[in-house]
Amino acid sequence: MNDQLSRAMRLLSQRDHSESELRRKLAAPPFSAKGNWGKRSGAKSSDVVESNLVESNPVESNLAESNAIEESDPQVIEQVIDYCYQHNWLDDSRFAASYINSRSRKGYGVQRIRSELMQKGVDKERILAAFENSEIDWCQLAKEVAQRKFSETLPVEWKEKAKVQRYLLYRGFFQEEIQSIYTDSVE
């Protein structure tokens, strides 16, 4: 459990994670300096001989297998997740709030952020609560994103307006927020 707990602490020290994201990362085998994912196809013959010797040693391979099984044991992962919750290192609500703030600063709208949070395993109730608690003016954000991409004065021709609209829809803004850009500029 200590290895998994140290992995969880390292992951959570870098940034907040959702529970399902952390669970998935803990279940995956960790990267290893001894792994063959970084070796080139033109390896020296001595490297191949050494790797064959390690693989042919049944004691070492059994130890490695038992460590790998222990590492991805669902009970151990569940204990680590519980420990993280008890120490307030893991919180899906906090993760959702920080993710919304981060992605909105990068110019993404509600629909895109909601979709990404659902992909990361955050449940709908927490996502909805996080959006309700956020103090982001989505109409103003849509206007700023459009002005940053196109120009300070937004286009008025139909063809150019359609381009702005497609871009903002792609970024995850609602149709009403996009329309408010032009109604606010007329008034």
Swiss-Prot record:
One Pfam family hit: RecX_HTH2
Compositional bias annotation for Basic and acidic residues: 13-24
Transmembrane segments: none
Record keyword Cytoplasm present: yes
Compartment annotation: Cytoplasm
Biological process terms in GO annotation: regulation of DNA repair
Statement: the UniProt record of this protein carries the keyword Nucleotidyltransferase: no
Principal subcellular localization: cytoplasm
Region of interest called Disordered, as start-end residue ranges on this chain: 1-44
Keywords: Cytoplasm
InterPro entries: RecX_HTH_2nd, RecX_HTH_3rd, Regulatory_RecX, WH-like_DNA-bd_sf
A single GO cellular-component term on record: cytoplasm
Domain of life: Bacteria
Function: Modulates RecA activity.
Similarity section: Belongs to the RecX family.
Protein known as: Regulatory protein RecX
Source organism of the structure: Yersinia pestis
Gene field: recX
